[in-house]
């Protein structure tokens, strides 16, 4: 099974979705399963993982509703307040929904660089394992020192870094990011998504060669057994259509074995998110 391990749906709301600025006009509209289905079919992708873009439990419910009648939506990564004293109760509720496979918090937007080390947040993370739920780590490179400490606290919790931790590709900054990624990747329970790269590059003038040093780094650090392809659609449309962004990964993994390619393009995501 081939899987796009990272995409979003939304009904655009200019207030709730204030992060989608006027400069992002191409994505200031609704994006729903009917929009994605033909793109997946054309790309030879069997299914996808729908990831939260809004921090509310209503978002988790919305993604489940998107999955109804759309069998290609194989998993939902929702949102729940992991800092809440009621987190155990809320996780028990969502764990009853078979498609809810994990959760994500938009840590990249937190002003505290050490947000991931908060005691209340870590209590919530510790409660995920009971229900077999995963956690997606969304951060910027300057937050990676906290990520290293965070992943060490939860050695049995399945964790995945979204978008290679958003390296500053446009600026060609790689040194500090590389050191941190290598340190974090030493921990076998941490995975990484090959996603979200085009929007960290020069949106209008990127070249595939721009991504190679970063892709080489994560392949060496995580190996083909802990990487998973994700489109970050529709956010990717700011810099590339579905076909162009997928081609970056396809071309990069072209020299790998068929087994390794199969794992990156779906097998790893299926195992991580418990997709059957």
Map each language-model feature to its residues.
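Histidine-centered catalytic micro-motifs
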Residues: 2-12, 161-164
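Divalent metal-dependent hydrolysis catalytic cores, especially in the metallo-beta-lactamase
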Residues: 21-29, 34-55, 73-81, 101-105, ...
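Mid-to-C-terminal alpha-helical segments outside catalytic/metal-binding sites
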Residues: 1-3, 14, 21, 25-47, ...
